[in-house]
């Protein structure tokens, strides 16, 4: 189950903050996941480690290419397309489905005021809730 959820990552994960005025104009963002919660039917939700969730803790959001990529930290390189991006006065809202054959979807919201990241990954039998921070990259 965790393997089917894995590698979506946001994460998000989405730790410094940048001013809101320039945040949406940047080309990419570095995001670190700080907390992960796994939720399943009957047993509910519990906090798990990034490793147990089989997630990468640091991701890059490339706004120009509309991709969510693993940070180049020596691990396996992955990139998932971002299906939709919406920018409001207060947030950047992202959505994607990763590998289509895995019956999963993910979404994320990044605060333009604080850089806080909240994200979720849903599959047929479970979901992950992710919390973290993002910062604009030069």
Where are these regions (language model features)?
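Positively charged n-region of N-terminal signal peptides that target proteins for export
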Residues: 1-7
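Bacterial N-terminal signal peptides
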Residues: 7-19
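Boundary at the C-terminal end of the N-terminal hydrophobic targeting segment
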Residues: 20-26
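Short, solvent-exposed loop/hinge segments that bridge or flank secondary-structure elements
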Residues: 28-66
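Short, solvent-exposed aromatic-acidic interface loops
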Residues: 35-38, 70-78, 123-128
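Contiguous, well-ordered beta-strand patches that form the walls/edges
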Residues: 64-103
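Short, exposed beta-strand-loop hairpins at the edges of beta-sheets
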Residues: 109, 117-129
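Short, low-complexity, Pro/Ser/Thr/Gly-rich segments in the mature regions of secreted, periplasmic
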Residues: 129-137
């Amino acid at each position: 189950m965790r393997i089917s959820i894995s590698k979506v990552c946001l994460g998000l994960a989405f730790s410094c903050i940048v001013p809101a005025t320039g945040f949406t104009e940047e080309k990419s963002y570095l995001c670190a996941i700080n907390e992960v919660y796994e939720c399943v039917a009957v047993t509910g939700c519990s906090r798990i480690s990034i490793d147990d969730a089989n997630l990468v803790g640091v991701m890059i959001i490339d706004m120009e290419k509309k991709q969510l990529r693993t940070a180049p930290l020596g691990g396996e390189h992955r990139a998932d397309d971002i299906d939709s991006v919406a920018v409001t006065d207060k947030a950047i809202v992202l959505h994607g489905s990763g590998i289509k054959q895995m019956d999963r979807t993910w979404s994320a919201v990044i605060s333009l005021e604080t850089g806080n990241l909240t994200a979720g990954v849903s599959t047929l039998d479970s979901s992950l809730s992710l919390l973290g921070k993002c910062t604009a990259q030069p």
